[in-house]
């Protein structure tokens, strides 16, 4: 390979790197439960994102009945009361706050959420195990 061709390939690669659109990766992590059985649900889902606007402006909701059906999960009254809100947890970290206004009486709550925003469209399932409150 001659020198001219080598330089040309390097220039094309470098220009390609600078002209590519930046990909902002968004992924969902584990869920942390802060409430007990027979209390209103209070949980946080860890969010990994390189773009604050992507998660803070995302549309977060319970996935459709069809998605739950395909996963073999039933949507109950507790699911319909769930609220999802993107929050900042400090030091540039983000989470999705999952809450209900009314107490959850089921010890296991399985659900699928859908997050759409920017270039991301994520669907992920979670299983929440609620322990009785400590006496």
Residue ranges and their predicted role:
Residues 1-135:
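Extracytoplasmic/periplasmic low-complexity
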């Amino acid at each position: 390979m001659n020198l001219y061709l080598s330089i040309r390939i390097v220039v094309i690669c470098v220009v390609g790197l600078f002209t590519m659109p930046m990909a902002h990766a968004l992924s969902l992590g584990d869920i942390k439960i802060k409430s007990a059985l027979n209390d209103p649900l209070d949980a946080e889902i860890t969010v990994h994102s390189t773009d604050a606007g992507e998660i803070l402006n995302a549309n977060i909701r319970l996935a459709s009945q069809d998605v739950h059906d395909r996963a073999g999960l039933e949507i109950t009254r507790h699911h319909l009361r769930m609220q999802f809100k993107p929050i900042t947890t400090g030091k540039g970290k983000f989470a999705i706050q999952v809450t209900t206004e009314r107490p959850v009486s089921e010890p296991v709550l399985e659900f699928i959420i859908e997050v759409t925003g920017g270039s991301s469209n994520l669907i992920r399932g979670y299983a929440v195990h609620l322990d009785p409150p400590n006496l």
